[in-house]
């Protein structure tokens, strides 16, 4: 076959396969058999392999998955992916309607209602009609680049029907039938199953190997336009129509409503129809349809005033409580958990539910053998709502919390002003294991590849008992563990080695000193600069530090007044673990050339590692100016958790937005 004929045939096959994909995955109206589709796809793959010069990034063949990725790159959203406020009953919906009408002084507002798909929110970027990048929502400001995995979802067009530049937002999901099939395969292979379709979709999208994502049969509904160049669309409903015309899959069950009564009727209708859909929904999204009215209403500190998410009531089911199991956390708190006869709740099989503490068991008079009502708080965490007393037979057993720790048999105590029982034995194996899990966690030593499962394996093999033991691990020991090969063992040893270079605040937080969180650990590290200086500090010296109270100061002094702790610190030194502060002190910032010099910065939301007051001081010390509102003169917005209206203002004025992680990276350069 000549090159000219091959090129023509490749183009014919691409057009044909794109049409087949659109008919099947967007219109739900397939025109050919699977066998015919596969024959055409294999012919295309073969021709492209023989003629690589004709390969295209938007060829249908990329949907089978490509090269394995090393890591997901971070992506800062051009416009933040904000969350919505919630409504839980009819009264909440009527309150929303009242607020909207008061805000726009218009009794003729029209709403658009859409099914709230229970999946993974993503953004899709197109330039001149070609799909160039897709990203997860992340924290709303920064997500992860998952372009290659999204290309495997056939409901996402790789090329639009117009050469338009835009950003669309949507929800990637796994159909129920695909979820059932996937879990059956995992069970047959002896693998852990996914709890629900949402987790399955998220887990598939975040696979580093796109070929795995390609096999998972994901789909996607696009629910909105974040922006589009050279086009003004007056309403949300018209933007959805426009997206459909471009080739996107939009949900056909949307409806415009002229009154709140029509909205409520729509909610009630889909609450009944919900089980019959082939995908999970967890509520209804209600939006003011008119875009000009949306802009007039604006946003609150947390969410848009012009939209709300109605959450379906948590599904409640009845099952029997067969026992109560106890777990011991890293601080020694003993928590009771109900063991249940397996029951399906909100799409997953539930076998355990939280009981929180002894007082709750007494308050609800929960006994072993009781029939209880179980629901998922927020459709996520199973909990016991109440006992069905009419079903009692008299054979149920009252439960009494033990007097001794279930893990080490030490006597349990209830500290002053605390509800929980606590084990105070420092050598309790359960506390040690949970402490190790905390030590390697993201905000502490951040050792990649060392999570709860691996820590448990290492602990059970008696390879680790203290934090310092982690730094004595060998590749040979790891190779003795299940699921470890040469590459994974080498990578983990390297990750542990890399953690030795962490700044002091990470080590301090990882030690798990009572009352000392990530922010306080950073405060101590910056103030004392070395572990040795902190160890020598008195309670009075600690209390003299801004925002350090008496309880925390006492806790720190008590922690370091322990020979075992001092021995641990000595071992860290011998293994080469850094115990000095590597960040920048405010006093040192005056002479530093910085990005922030001459910049106007706005801080919004909750900053986890560094408080806003401390961040303000450091920016100002670097020559920057911190203001309370966003304007055209603002250079940067630093957004923490629960950032709200200032993000919308940043988008309006085209101001760059950073999350806390990006801010700290720049600050510590």
UniProtKB/Swiss-Prot annotation:
Family to which the UniProt record says this protein belongs: Belongs to the NAD-dependent DNA ligase family. LigA subfamily.
NCBIfam families: dnlj, PRK07956.1
Protein EC: 6.5.1.2
Lineage of origin: Bacteria, Bacillati, Bacillota, Bacilli, Bacillales
Cofactor(s) needed by this chain: Mg(2+); Mn(2+)
Alphabetical GO biological process terms: DNA repair; DNA replication
Function: DNA ligase that catalyzes the formation of phosphodiester linkages between 5'-phosphoryl and 3'-hydroxyl groups in double-stranded DNA using NAD as a coenzyme and as the energy source for the reaction. It is essential for DNA replication and repair of damaged DNA.
Protein name: DNA ligase
Domain BRCT: 591-669
């Amino acid at each position: 076959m000549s090159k000219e004929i091959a090129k023509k045939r490749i183009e014919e096959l691409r057009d044909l396969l794109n049409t087949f994909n659109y008919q099947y995955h967007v219109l739900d109206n397939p025109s050919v058999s699977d066998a015919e589709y596969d024959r055409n796809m294999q012919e295309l793959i073969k021709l492209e392999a023989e003629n690589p010069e004709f390969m295209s990034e938007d060829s249908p063949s990329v949907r089978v998955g490509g090269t394995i990725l090393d890591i997901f790159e971070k992506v800062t959203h051009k416009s933040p992916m904000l969350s919505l406020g919630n409504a839980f009953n009819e009264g909440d919906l009527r309150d929303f309607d009242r607020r909207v009408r008061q805000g726009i002084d218009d009794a003729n507002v029209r709403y658009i209602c859409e099914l709230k798909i229970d999946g993974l929110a993503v953004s899709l970027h197109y330039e001149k009609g070609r799909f160039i990048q897709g990203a997860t929502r992340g924290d709303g400001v920064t997500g992860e680049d998952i372009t290659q995995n999204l290309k495997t979802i056939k409901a996402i067009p790789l090329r639009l029907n117009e050469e338009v530049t835009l950003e669309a937002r949507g929800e990637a999901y796994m159909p129920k039938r695909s979820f059932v099939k996937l879990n059956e395969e995992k069970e047959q292979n002896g693998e852990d199953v996914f709890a629900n379709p949402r987790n399955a979709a998220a887990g598939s999208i975040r696979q580093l190997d796109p070929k795995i994502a390609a096999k998972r049969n994901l789909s996607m509904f696009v629910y909105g336009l974040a922006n589009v160049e050279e086009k003004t669309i007056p309403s949300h409903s018209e933007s959805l129509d426009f997206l459909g015309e471009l080739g996107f899959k939009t949900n056909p069950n949307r409806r415009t409503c002229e009154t709140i009564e029509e909205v409520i009727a729509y909610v009630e209708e889909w609450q009944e129809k919900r089980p019959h859909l082939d995908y999970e929904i967890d509520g209804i999204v209600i939006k003011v349809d008119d875009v000009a009215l949306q802009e007039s209403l604006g946003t609150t500190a947390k969410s848009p005033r012009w939209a709300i998410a109605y959450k379906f009531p948590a599904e409640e089911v009845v099952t029997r409580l067969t026992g109560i199991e106890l777990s011991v956390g890293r601080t020694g708190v003993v928590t009771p958990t109900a063991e249940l006869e397996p029951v399906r709740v909100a799409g997953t099989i539930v076998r355990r539910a939280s009981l929180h503490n002894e007082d709750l068991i007494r308050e609800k008079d929960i006994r072993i053998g009781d029939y209880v009502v179980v629901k998922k708080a927020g459709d996520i965490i199973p909990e016991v709502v109440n006992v069905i007393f009419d079903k009692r037979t008299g054979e149920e057993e009252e439960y009494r919390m033990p007097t001794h720790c279930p893990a080490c048999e030490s006597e349990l105590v209830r500290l002053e002003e605390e509800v929980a029982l606590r084990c105070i034995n420092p050598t309790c194996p359960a506390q040690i294991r949970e402490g190790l899990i905390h030590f390697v966690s993201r905000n502490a030593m951040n050792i990649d590849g060392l999570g709860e499962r691996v820590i448990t394996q290492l602990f059970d093999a008696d390879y680790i008992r203290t934090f310092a033991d982690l730094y004595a691990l060998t590749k040979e020991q790891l190779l003795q563990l299940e699921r470890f090969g040469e590459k994974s063992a080498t990578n983990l040893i390297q990750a542990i080695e890399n953690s030795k270079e962490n700044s002091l605040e990470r080590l301090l937080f990882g030690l798990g000193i009572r009352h000392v969180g990530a922010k306080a650990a950073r405060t101590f590290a910056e103030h004392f600069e070395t572990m040795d200086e902190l160890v020598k500090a008195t309670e009075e010296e600690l209390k003299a530090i801004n925002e350090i109270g008496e309880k925390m100061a006492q806790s720190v002094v008590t922690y370091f007044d322990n020979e075992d702790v001092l021995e641990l610190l000595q071992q860290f030194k011998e293994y080469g673990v850094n115990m000095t502060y590597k960040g920048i002190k405010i006093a040192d910032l005056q002479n530093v050339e910085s990005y922030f010099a001459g910049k106007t910065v706005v801080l919004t939301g909750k900053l986890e590692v560094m408080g806003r007051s401390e961040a303000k001081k450091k920016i100002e010390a670097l020559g920057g100016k911190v203001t309370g509102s966003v304007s055209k003169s603002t250079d940067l917005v630093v957004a923490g958790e629960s950032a709200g209206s200032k993000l919308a203002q940043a988008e309006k004025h085209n101001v760059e937005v950073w999350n806390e992680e990006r801010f700290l990276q720049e600050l510590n350069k």
